[in-house]
């Protein structure tokens, strides 16, 4: 589980945002970005500082309800408890589109979970499907290895790495955007399905977007719509996708500017700025012959999904998502943490866990104390409708 990402991966969030209850990053590079090994060390140290009774090498194979609460089966034995917090996250399995089944068997395919570095790929061109954080990072890395890369782009979230001389995630944090609560969001279901922003964590704080990749020589095509008779068919809506992503980015930058007008008095913060619109290719290919030898491998960077195959409690909807209201699951004594927009927009990030956990503790404590309250209501006066 610790090695299910590519070798060069770094967090999208700067080190100063890596904080958990009673523990935070205190190294010499607060504006840097943690590697996978850094994250492992950070979490391991937190567990030691917190004195948490962590059981390593103890995978849970099932959770089921009993009259007294819950029974967990693990490879190290059985655990019985009154309450369970599900913190397994939302990125357990690769989300591979159904069109993958029509790809010619002669073309090796892998997902972002299986990819480690360019050396594992066969020589020749690479098609990467998906242009969120994972897709753009892999496209950049593989292109730098000397291969021709074709990047298939669908809906995406464009962000600059820095804005007005500050990391863009500083703005998300300071302006309160990340603290927006789930019951204040108009379309919560859509917010929970948004792809990760096009960001990369590098010492140079590089902005990695479609324009940067195009300028480097990566070929940009539309969303992969189908594979028929050995040909990949791409949608022709690139300009619309780019215009929508640019519009949403500029609206967010407007939000930052409005907040800064009344809250920021630091001379080190630069003036408002706007970025060049995403450049659409003069003519992008609508189809690609996968049998021509031009594409020698495909990487599915099309997102992830949760895995609840081990959860023997009827709280998962037909799409595989947990039914919960702000982390209070549709079963007494069952809770969740670490899911997209669980209680705030920052819920999936390391520093988002503390506030969410604090909100749920009171509900959990009252449940264990035998208090009478409706499952699903964390705070009075707040929304209690369940959202999956």
Please annotate each region the language model reported.
Residues 1-24, 28, 158-179:
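Conserved N-terminal glycine-rich FAD pyrophosphate-binding loop of Rossmann-like flavoproteins
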Residues 32-388:
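Flavin (primarily FAD) cofactor-binding/catalytic cores of flavoenzymes
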